[in-house]
């Protein structure tokens, strides 16, 4: 599979760029310390800014890898870093998912966007704008034929974001937090063929 790595992406309101250790103060203050933001995610709120700093320093070492995708979501009008969005191979953390996608090519893994933004930016369409841009980036810069996406059953708002980006519901599955807690999820797929049909010049 041809990968593209984490390159800058710009939308009308947002800049998606690599996260840096210097982003730690805004990441911690705007979303990483908030239990409401992390409620349906795999990780728990950061205890202090040192934890955020340590994570960002570790991520910085991964950016040279072309199969590593992790962006800061920056509000262009203010310069605020208020969230993150990534694409990751969910088979690495959830190997049982291999049995949940009959008919899909899993030879290169199950590549899945994940995102979270600070509460102050909820309800403004920012996540939808970022996810749409990420999907476009993926299909233009890699040769992957599909993307997966999932959300906790109890977090239907995230499903609305996925559907606005073209994802189609496929099945329910159980994912897990890093501490092993099971989270019932709804899983979606977006194929290259369907994506291109949505954005063909004749539409």
Please identify what each model-predicted range represents:
Residues 38-58, 71:
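Conserved GNAT-fold acetyl-CoA-binding loop/helix
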Residues 36, 46, 65-68, 147:
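Secondary-structure boundary/capping residues
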Residues 1-26, 30-36, 72-203:
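Acyl-donor (CoA/ACP) binding surface of acyl/acetyltransferases
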Residues 31, 41, 63-64:
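Hydrophobic residues in alpha-helical segments
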């Amino acid at each position: 599979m041809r990968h593209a790595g984490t390159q800058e992406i710009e939308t009308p309101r947002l800049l998606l760029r690599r996260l840096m250790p210097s982003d730690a103060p805004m990441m911690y203050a705007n979303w990483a310390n908030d239990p409401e933001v992390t409620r349906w995610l795999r990780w728990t709120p950061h205890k202090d800014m040192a934890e955020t700093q340590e994570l960002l320093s570790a991520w910085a070492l991964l950016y040279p890898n072309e199969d590593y995708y992790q962006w800061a979501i920056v509000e262009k009008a203010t310069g605020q870093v208020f969230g993150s969005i990534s694409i990751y191979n969910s088979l690495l953390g959830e190997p049982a998912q291999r049995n949940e996608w009959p008919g899909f090519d899993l030879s290169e893994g199950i590549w899945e966007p994940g995102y979270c933004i600070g509460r102050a930016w909820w309800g403004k369409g920012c996540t939808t704008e970022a996810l749409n841009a990420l999907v476009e980036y993926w299909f233009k810069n890699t040769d992957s034929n599909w993307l997966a996406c999932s959300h906790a059953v109890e977090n239907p708002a995230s499903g609305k974001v996925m559907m606005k980006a073209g994802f189609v519901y496929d099945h329910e599955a159980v994912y897990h937090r890093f501490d092993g807690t099971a989270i019932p999820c709804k899983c979606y797929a977006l194929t290259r063929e369907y994506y291109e049909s949505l954005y063909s010049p004749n539409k």
